[in-house]
């Protein structure tokens, strides 16, 4: 290459001039100088053979070079008969393996309709760029990339010039610093990096996507490794059909993508010491779907002992898209498309193994909105039970966990109904909520109540007619349900027994054309700051106009993340110090990130004005956690008829409503039965059973009579039940007080006449045994009926095959009636006093 690029053009003249001779001499000198200054290629030994990497300088004077080992195999190729099977250890090799090029990515297809609602903004806005990272996919794709920091002479020199009294400078200048020492102002023992000259912490990144696409090759871990003095690892794992197909039985159990991640962690645990890493300080982190994978890994016994800490960015195992509860349905659809739909699942899987990977991944199988077609499944092994049950049992308490969300995660959920200039109309708002309820909760009897209550909660009544306000609240609705509530519940369950937990809310994003100007920090906006992209400038995937504030915030985030990987505490050992960017101190130097606990719920607001706050969106979290599950089952608990709003009979034939997606695709949903806005039969918009179904929603302003009637009915019902319960208890107590007066005296030996005067009803009440109920059922025609005491049995999410399942958030203790309803702990779905570390009984759950 040098001969092609650096050799000057020489003339064939027999008598070269002095100038040409001088150029030739200078060229040879430059070659010698380049060869003498070029660092030798790093090599490292592993249990499977030797690797040769490359030392790569970074385009920043504060960042030292990084040794990169790309395309390191961590498992045997899952090809042929090994397709749809757990991974196996990689084969050994002889000689030195060249690890200087990215490996092939796992087979995937981003040219069909991708589920944009689950993908980060920087991914969906740059699909053409993303396509360049997934060219020439191959089933032989189970490789990882290792980024190892080296000595940073330039950064040390700059730090010593700025602070000559630092220990590393007093010991003999920058040249005396050992590889691995941090540049923090560690004059005090409390600021010392506990492993300065020893083994480095390891951070393993699980890429996101939608379980259908993605690769670790898209994320460069060099800046994070160099700045944070940690070893960063990215990896590929099987995605889509090849990674998560499941028949629901032993023929194809599924979860191969998760098993790939576990095998990668096993390889790291056994080999990272050769790279200078500490196998006792391995942190797994990810964003979006990657965060859901991390959350699931903390619940699996297969990953025990393979890592110690987890950073969960904008995701949770409790999100609706984290687990696939209908794997057989989508496997059958795939088998139909490729001609493998046979009754015997073993034969079906054998047939699918004979198909090419390209044929399988190119099949366009669209899941229900807010769900996944191919993803992790509850198989009784890798994921032994429902994630919320596992969290209740404390399966993840041995890990230190840091987790959080971005301010406007739900941007992609509303982009299709948003006018960039005018906001969201009232009709679009109503339709979005109705579609949300249909896709997540199906068509329960109490769907109208649930829908109207959600709209009530997410209407800004002080500015209800402002389209921009509707747009903001609609983004908040999806953000709260899909990200905030699952993350807060995860944090509560992890922290309630004292396990180290840290929570954050990310409120900053770079300026770019990838999303609207009105948007907040959207899904995936924290990723460039975690990996230090602002320090090296815009990239093809992150074409932002980074400012000094962006560089400062990226340095802050990397310090927090790497501190947590080092000690389990984001505040130490390295203090926040970005004076090499700004001459004045940043606000983070005065902020101490407090631990999270279920009572105070302290979290760090990460933005240009950082602060520690408490109870992040507590009202909305309580709404989704406690009220919505009861509203969903409202029809089963009691029946009532609204007296203020005319409700049409339920529409048993749901017509199909086609909606254009932002990317040009269409998706079909069933039209919900909408209550009319006005009860006047003569009004233009009134409902008429003889008329054909009109538009989905009326354009006229609504008077919210339905919401008012629902609120009044629910409140009155609860009040009435409380009065009945109180009256029953008072009646029983009064009877017990009067019972001694009615019993015969021993001296008199009589008393039968007194008892005989009591009515038969009172006599029966006095003779009730302890197994009877205090309140018997009323006449069958009563609107409200008091039944037996509630049976709090853990109800899993189940649904018919033709409607999507409920979200993981709807696992709740559902009473059979409202009588005797026990008070639930604010952070627990079990009744107060129940030991949540174990299930209520061995038969209280049913595997979906």
UniProtKB/Swiss-Prot annotation:
Positions annotated as glycosylated: 98, 545
The record's account of how the chain is modified after translation: The N-terminus is blocked.
Major place of residence: membrane
Residue ranges of coiled coil: none
Cysteine pairings via disulfide bonds: 106-141, 340-351, 510-544
Comp. bias (Polar residues): 645-656, 677-689
Ranges of the Extracellular topological domain: 38-709
Protein's UniProt name: Neuroligin-3
Organism placement in taxonomy: Eukaryota, Metazoa, Chordata, Craniata, Vertebrata
């Amino acid at each position: 290459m040098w001969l092609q690029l650096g050799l000057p053009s020489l003339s064939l003249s027999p008598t070269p001039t002095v100038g040409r001779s001088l150029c030739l001499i200078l060229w040879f000198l430059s070659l010698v100088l380049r060869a003498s200054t070029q660092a030798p290629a790093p090599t490292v030994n592993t249990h499977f053979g030797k690797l040769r990497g490359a030392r790569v300088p970074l385009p920043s004077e504060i960042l030292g070079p990084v040794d990169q080992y790309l395309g390191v195999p961590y498992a045997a190729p899952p090809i042929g008969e090994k397709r749809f099977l757990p991974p196996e250890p990689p084969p050994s090799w002889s000689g030195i393996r060249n690890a200087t090029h990215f490996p092939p990515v796992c087979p995937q297809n981003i040219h069909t309709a991708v589920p944009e609602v689950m993908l980060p903004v920087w991914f969906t806005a740059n699909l053409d760029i993303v396509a360049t990272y997934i060219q020439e996919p191959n089933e032989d794709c189970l490789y990882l990339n290792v980024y190892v920091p080296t000595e940073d002479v330039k950064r040390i020199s700059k730090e010593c010039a700025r602070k000559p009294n630092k220990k590393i400078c007093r010991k003999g200048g920058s040249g005396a610093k050992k590889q691995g020492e941090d540049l923090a102002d560690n004059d005090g023992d409390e600021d010392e990096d506990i492993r300065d000259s020893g083994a480095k912490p390891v951070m393993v990144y699980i890429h996101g996507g939608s379980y259908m696409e993605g690769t670790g090759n898209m994320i460069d871990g060099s800046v994070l490794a160099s700045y944070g003095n940690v070893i960063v690892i990215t990896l590929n794992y099987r995605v889509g059909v090849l990674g998560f197909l499941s028949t629901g039985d032993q023929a194809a159990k599924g979860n191969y993508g998760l098993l790939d991640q576990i095998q990668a962690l096993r390889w790291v645990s056994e080999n990272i010491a050769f790279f200078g890493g500490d196998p006792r300080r391995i942190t797994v982190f990810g964003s979006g779907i990657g965060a859901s994978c991390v959350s699931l890994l903390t619940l699996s016994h297969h990953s025990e002992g393979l890592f110690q800490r987890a950073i969960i960015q904008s995701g949770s195992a409790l999100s609706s898209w984290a687990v696939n509860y209908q794997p057989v349905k989508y496997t059958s659809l795939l088998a139909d498309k490729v001609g493998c739909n046979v009754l015997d699942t073993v034969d079906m899987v054998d047939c699918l193994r004979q198909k090419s990977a390209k044929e399988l991944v190119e099949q366009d199988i669209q899941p229900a909105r807010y769900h996944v077609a191919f993803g992790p499944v509850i198989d009784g092994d890798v994921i032994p039970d429902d994630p919320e049950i596992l969290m209740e049992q404390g399966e993840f308490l041995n890990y230190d966990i840091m987790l959080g969300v971005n301010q406007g995660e739900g941007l992609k959920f509303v982009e299709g109904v948003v006018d960039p200039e005018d906001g969201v109309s009232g009709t679009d708002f109503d339709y979005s909520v109705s579609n949300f309820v249909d896709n997540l909760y199906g068509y329960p009897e109490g769907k109208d109540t649930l829908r109207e209550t959600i709209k009530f909660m997410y209407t800004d009544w002080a500015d209800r007619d402002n389209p921009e306000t509707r747009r903001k609240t609609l983004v908040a609705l999806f953000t709260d349900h899909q990200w905030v509530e699952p993350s807060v519940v995860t944090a509560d369950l992890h922290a309630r027994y004292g396990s180290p937990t840290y929570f954050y809310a990310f409120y900053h994003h770079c300026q770019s054309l990838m999303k609207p100007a009105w948007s907040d920090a959207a899904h995936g906006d924290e990723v460039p700051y975690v990996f230090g992209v602002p320090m090296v400038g815009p990239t093809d995937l992150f074409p932002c106009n980074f400012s000094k504030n962006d560089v400062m915030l990226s340095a802050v985030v990397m310090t927090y993340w790497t501190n947590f990987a080092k000690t389990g505490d984001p505040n130490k050992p390295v203090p926040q110090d970005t004076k090499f960017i700004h001459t004045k101190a940043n606000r983070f130097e005065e902020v101490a990130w407090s631990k999270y606990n279920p009572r105070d719920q302290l979290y760090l607001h990460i933005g240009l004005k950082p602060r520690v706050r408490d109870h992040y969106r507590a009202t909305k979290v309580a709404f989704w956690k406690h009220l919505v599950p009861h509203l969903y089952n409202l029809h089963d608990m009691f029946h009532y008829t609204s007296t203020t709003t005319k409700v049409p009979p339920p529409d048993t034939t749901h017509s199909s409503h086609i909606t254009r997606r932002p990317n040009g695709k269409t998706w079909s949903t069933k039209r919900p039965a909408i209550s009319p806005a006005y009860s006047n039969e003569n009004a233009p918009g009134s409902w008429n059973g003889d008329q054909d179904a009109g538009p989905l929603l009326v354009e006229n302003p609504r008077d919210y009579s339905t919401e008012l009637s629902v609120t009044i009915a629910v409140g009155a019902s609860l009040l009435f039940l409380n009065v009945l319960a109180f009256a029953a208890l008072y009646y029983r107590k009064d009877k017990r007080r009067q019972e001694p007066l009615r019993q015969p005296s021993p001296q008199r030996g009589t008393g039968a006449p007194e008892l005989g005067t009591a009515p038969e009803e009172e006599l029966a009440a006095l003779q009730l045994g302890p197994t009877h109920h205090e309140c018997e059922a009323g006449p069958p025609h009563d609107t409200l009926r008091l039944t037996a005491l509630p049976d709090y049995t853990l109800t899993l999410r189940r649904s018919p095959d033709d409607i999507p399942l409920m979200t993981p958030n709807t696992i709740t203790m559902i009473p059979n009636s409202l009588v005797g309803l026990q008070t639930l702990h604010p952070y627990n779905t079990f009744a107060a006093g129940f030991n949540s570390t174990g299930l209520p009984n061995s038969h209280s759950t049913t595997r979906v």
